[in-house]
Amino acid sequence: ACTPNPPAKEERMSTDKWEKMDIVLTTETYPPLPEEADTLYRYALWHDINTRRKPSTRHKLLPYLRYYRIAAANGHWQANKTLQHILMYNEDVDIPDRRDEGVALNELLAQQLPATADLWWSTYILFGYGPKHDKGDAAAYLRRAADRGNPEAMYMIAELLSDQAVRLPEGEERRRLLDLSDKFYRYSADKIHRFPSGKGGEQASITATVIQHNAEDAMFYAQQSLRGGAYQGAVRLQLIFEGEEKELSVKPDQERAHRYEVISDYLFTTFEVYPEATVEEIDDIVPLPPAPLPEWDGKLNIQRFVEGEEPPKPAEELVEKLAAAKGLDPATGLPLPKKETARRWWNWWD
């Protein structure tokens, strides 16, 4: 969640300069979120999500950006990722110097989540800005993000390898690239990840179903896809437990199928919960067989948050304290002019 969107296929990078293609599978470790900064983040996020359905309401987000900025400056990596996504993709929100702010935020993120920051650097370079770079550096950052354990980078590499393979004639090299692509899809959705790639899990599940006829893998990777927030994982599991995937010979289970249908319907129709939405709690809702089904009230954690009451507004004393600790203006969350503490991390401020 909250990772850069892959660029269009024609803009994607080349693997020509990579010394090796495979990686040693690892994952990124997420530090605990600071509690005080989290109160700012949750307050901003609730209002943010409630402005996303209509572009005409996005301007209402502006007063809440300061909470994201101050939270990010105080080590809240989720606020950092959400804010970078807003700066990159939400043109409906009028934010001056959005590119420089995004770069500064990513420099800060690199101190906590270096693999995620590398993925953002790769995307920034493809869009024409970011760190000083040479041709091919977008691919280098993407590769390093995967080496450092970012599952979305692994998924994007799988897509890149697949794109290269389908352009080749039938033969050994085409098969090699397709096999390697399949491996990276599985890497991206491996159980090692806290936030597996939703799209990567979906592709791995499709391969396990259509090509390998492996029911255990098909269900596992679809569950990982859903854990990563992709409604497509729930759709696949609904079909499997309805008995529609004949290649798998899975015993139909209507209650499991129904729960997956409820989940997929919510995620598909409630697009405003993205990019933050994940379903980390999926095993507490619909564990895979043979585990029995627990009681469930029919709602996801993100759904309870969005539909629940507005989080308490953070006290101005707390906002001012956290802002002062990082040399920020509490009214905007931007660095105060001529503050060396601000320049340490927000290098675009003049």
Predicted feature locations:
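Short helix-capping/linker turns of helical repeat alpha-solenoids
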Residues: 33-40, 48-50, 74-78, 83, ...
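Post-signal peptide N-terminal segment of secreted/secretory-pathway proteins
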Residues: 48-101
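Structural signature of tandem alpha-helical TPR/SEL1-like repeats
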Residues: 56-66, 94-105, 131-141, 168-184, ...
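TPR/TPR-like (Sel1-like) alpha-helical repeat modules
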Residues: 176-186, 219-232, 238-270
